[in-house]
């Protein structure tokens, strides 16, 4: 068996490779990989995220998604599906079950074991700290089902404001009184000034964002 001849753009002459076969650098994303998708997928899920209802930070006023004026992508034909918290049969999706197991929940409602995929609709994703020291509340995270405290991949964390303090001024009246009629004094108060820019208020604290679909690789 001869050694293959390989030409590249860096040299004008062919050269022989020292490898019997050229290595494959990228074989594609692994099963269980999650990626943002800018297009519209079908079907659009309208079910409520029930995982967060188990937590103290459940939201209300949910609204079902609507179709945008854009093409619809049927991503499941390409091995991807929307991260919408659905249950799948382990016998039908053995590769994905081998990755997720019962991490996000499982049940035996039918003759076959079913496992749940993560539900990332309307959520921001954060890298698992894994001892990196960047998540000061890591020990208070909730497990992927929202039922118990657990610092694991897939765990949940409620929205919050960092603990802080604000100084403020107090006017303390003082005076000397003598025998005679009672004297009175008034206490002045101060308030914070108006913000330089009109403040934006909403039902949650959030950064600027763009809505995307999070997809998970199942085959």
Curated annotation (Swiss-Prot):
Keyword Repeat: no
Annotated spans, Disordered: 174-201
Entry-linked InterPro entries: Phage_tail_collar_dom (IPR011083), Phage_tail_collar_dom_sf (IPR037053)
Organism domain of life: Bacteria
Keywords: Plasmid
Pfam families tied to this protein: Collar
Keyword Plastid in record: no
Composition skew (Polar residues), residue ranges: 174-195
Biological role stated in the UniProt entry: May be involved in plant-microbe interaction.
Name of the protein described by the UniProt record: Protein RhiB
Lineage start: Bacteria, Pseudomonadati, Pseudomonadota, Alphaproteobacteria, Hyphomicrobiales
Primary gene name: rhiB
